[in-house]
Amino acid sequence: MFDLLLRRARLVDDTLTDIAIQDGKIAALGEISAPSRKTIELNGKVYVSAGWIDSHVHCYPNSPIYHDEPDSVGIATGVTTVIDAGSTGADDVDDFYQLTRKAATEVYALLNISRVGLIAQNELANMANIDAAAVKQAVQRHPDFIVGLKARMSSSVVGENGITPLARAKAIQQENDDLPLMVHIGNNPPNLDEIADLLSSGDIITHCYNGKPNRILNPAGELRSSITRALQRGVRLDVGHGTASFSFEVARRAIALGILPHTISSDIYCRNRIDGPVRSLALVMSKFLAIGMTLPQVIDCVTVSAAEGLRLSRKGRLEVGFDADLTLFRLEHRPTLLVDAEKESLQADNILVPLAAIRAGKGYLTEQGSAEHACVSSHRYCNCLRTLKEGLPDVDAAYR
């Protein structure tokens, strides 16, 4: 007998399937007749994908500048896995690890190459903060938690050190089994061409569609040749929207040139979650639908491609044996004015609305799902939401 059965779930290709869960894993797909302790009848009204993965968040609660709670940026918004992108370094990653053990959301970390992490904006201005031995020891202490490294390569961070911190980061990467390296780009120096030329296959450029002068497009609106070469080597592009790092103009132009992101991520923390312009991963994903990406393309960027980029081998796919991490959502026709980090706006016809998440077989209504469950009975989705609330095992409101 299965623990949970989702019947007639709609996939992003609009096919319908049953999904069975047992012992925290996906146990069966297709037309399923076997019994289950709990059954949720979705009747094709709700999309189900592999659990959404946000490849770039800041959720170390004790960070003095970029902080949030893992479940506030994760399970409450339909995101089952988050990767904190460099909030902690070797000095405070142990504390972060312990705090994440209490979260419903699966949390991983990209370790800041600065041992002090993000205690200030200029963590790489002092080269003494880059301690290769401390990084190696931290990775050895937390091999299943630290899934990569993070280096922020913009002028306010590196000070007078230019490209040198990135050269050190690449050496540290080689000493740690070539863990994925995420590199933040922003204002120069260092120049983006210098940064891109140092990167190799599997490295990740985050804030790839930022609107700053040091962007991936040249003044003529064409892709920089250094980025073309980097992509040919297997370097990956991550959105990392954030407060100041996403431009509709740059994203539209790049995507028109065929330069799509490998991963869509939020760079969310408490301030840009509450005050915008980020709000949630779902809203960032909706911006890419508005720009012209298809629903399957967008979902791939937060599931299979995100898992592959960070070597999360048990996540990102709706396949038997994978973790039972699922996001239940709908694509709603709701004209919405979306805003980027440059304060430019774009009218969207449709937005993604996460209703519930299942993490390792445990179910949670999202904040939006909970709010809509309190709808009037005439609402066309009310019966479905009631079914979700009644059917999900161990629905937990602890993240609120």
Model-identified regions with their sequence ranges:
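Divalent metal-coordination and catalytic microenvironments
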Residues: A9, G24, K45, H56, ...
